[in-house]
Design a protein with these regions (language model features):
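Recognition helix of helix-turn-helix/homeodomain-like DNA-binding domains
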Residues: 26-41
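DNA major-groove recognition helix of helix-turn-helix/homeodomain DNA-binding modules
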Residues: 26, 45-60
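Short basic helix-loop element that most often maps to the first helix and adjoining turn
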Residues: 5-24
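Conserved hydrophobic/aromatic packing and binding residues within compact polymer-binding modules
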Residues: 7, 21-22, 32-35, 61
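DNA major-groove recognition helix of helix-turn-helix
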Residues: 25, 36, 54, 65
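Short, charged recognition helix plus adjacent turn
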Residues: 60-75
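Helix-turn-helix DNA-binding elements, focusing on the entry/boundary residues of the two helices
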Residues: 7, 18, 29, 44-47
Length: 75
């Protein structure tokens, strides 16, 4: 899953508007919308803010993992 789809799904699953999430990353609603639609790139500092806000790992957010939280090591 690509990160834009994950962004939208996380926002919708938490019953949030684009404007509400845009405030978290200090963007306008339009700026946030452009990221979700693929017309602008998500900056790394905004990725970190969103991961902290949603309490998910960056691997999950960008689609590397299907697990929202870091898996414990089997050591």
């Amino acid at each position: 899953m690509d990160y834009r789809t994950r962004m939208r799904n996380l926002r919708e699953d938490n019953d949030l508007t684009q404007k509400q999430v845009a405030i978290i990353i200090n963007k306008s609603q339009q700026g946030y919308s452009h990221i979700e639609e693929g017309r602008a790139e998500l900056k790394i500092d905004d990725l970190i803010k969103l991961c902290k806000f949603y309490n998910v790992s960056s691997d999950y957010f960008i689609g590397i993992s299907e697990y929202p939280h870091t898996e414990p090591s089997n050591k």
